[in-house]
């Protein structure tokens, strides 16, 4: 077993001889380490495991190594799903999305669906409230988080321009989709 930085490119690990497993370890919302396990004489694709460490134990998701066919969309449905660090690094979010019939939004590692996604510690679920042009969104007074994906302005600049205080229940995604810029207001379900 070898321990690697969370920044390691998984494609580099695939070059290791007799690689049987790759564990992506998440703790408190951060990818903490990547473990590569090699067994003498092992031949075949490695099992990919997303491991979520908690104070009272751990939860694992394991890849099936099946081919994945995702459908991509430009517009959002009723719900938005954002994979956590272990799912994002392991790319197991693609397997879950295929099983759950989620559609991959063309922005980042975000998915959308009209069905309420199941509750999971491996991803965050949001209800889409509004999709608008930059700075045209109607924001709730209780505040929220801001995350940018490909958007040129820093979240603090966006927050200042909007005059929106910090909060936990709501989130604003400032995204760049091709040449278009959008702001997506969502309400956290977890």
Write out the residue ranges for each language-model feature.
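SAM-dependent transferase fold signal centered on methyltransferase-like domains
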Residues: 1-190
